[in-house]
Amino acid sequence: MVEKVYNMTYSDKRTVEMLISDENVHYLHMIFNKGEGLPEHFSNSNVYMTVLKGILSIALNEQIIHEYEQGSVLKIPFKTKMNVGNKHDEILELIVVKAPAPVK
């Protein structure tokens, strides 16, 4: 096989999984229930977030929280302060792509 296949977790439980981590890209899958999310942090690359399910609540730098529904794709610049979470009853499911891959 030329391709390499990766499998995402399908769950109702909090999930943060790195599916692909190579020299080109980091490709993550995340699932958050109401009140869950990531600790506040700064983006370590350009970040592309796709909302697969639910409503994303996100504050960037000093902005107020903005909300994005299923089907939204966000492009977030390198070194942006991020506060990512789910403030709604419906499960939030995201794909996060970091490109280029962050340098350690």
Stretch-by-stretch model annotation:
Residues 45-56, 61:
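Glycine- and acidic-residue-biased ligand/ion/polar-headgroup-sensing regions
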Residues 29, 39, 48, 64-65:
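Short, surface-exposed secondary-structure edge patches
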Residues 1-26:
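A short, N-terminal "cap"/entry segment at the start of jelly-roll beta-barrel domains
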Residues 63-78:
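Short acidic-glycine-tyrosine-enriched beta hairpin
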Residues 78-102:
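Ligand-binding loop in jelly-roll beta-barrel domains
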Residues 26-43:
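Conserved short histidine dyad/triad with adjacent acidic residue
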